[in-house]
Amino acid sequence: MGLFNLFRRKNMSEEIKEYLAKGAIVLDVRTLEEWNEGHTEGAEHIVLTVIPLEIEKIKSWGKPIIAVCRSGARSGQATQFLANNGIDVINGGPWGNVDQHVSKG
């Protein structure tokens, strides 16, 4: 099982890199308090519960989305909602998963 998780992580990492290369926008769906504790530079912040109200704004970005949160649960919910609304999106999981790639350029 440990090997499976390692393989899955590598796939997620590669997918994140691919999306960043396509100019994806990082969408952080955590609370304002969590966001203020640290976030990926250049990320957009829309709290999960507000996403349905901001769907037209998100669509207007016209770019793929990498949804992130603290653990991957809320970003998973956001990913499902955005995908159901025709947006090219992946669940980046915890924001640190994406941040490590953004910081390295």
Q: What is each residue range found by the language model?
A:
Residues 68:
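Short, surface-exposed ligand- or partner-binding patches at beta-edge/loop junctions that are enriched
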Residues 2-24, 32-64, 73-105:
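Rhodanese-like catalytic fold shared by cysteine-dependent sulfurtransferases
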Residues 28:
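Phosphate-rich cofactor/ligand-interacting catalytic cores and adjacent structured alpha/beta frameworks
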